[in-house]
């Protein structure tokens, strides 16, 4: 899913919870949501890896399944 810059409406480059607009240079925080219940996910970082955990009963969520939205 492509997210667009709220300032200039260009497509954002996404990287692990952050987004950057190539056009205007804006840096934007993103929020990770569970694809099943759409609740915020807990971000677990260890040894260079980033994992996502749903505290509402859906457990560990693959990075490929996480829904990112602008925070």
UniProtKB/Swiss-Prot annotation:
Native species: Escherichia coli (strain K12)
Coiled-coil segments on the chain, per record: none
InterPro entries hit by this protein: DUF1407/YfgJ-like_sf, YfgJ-like
Top-level taxon of origin: Bacteria
GO biological process terms held by the UniProt record: bacterial-type flagellum-dependent swarming motility
A Pfam family assignment: Zn_ribbon_6
Protein's UniProt name: Uncharacterized protein YfgJ
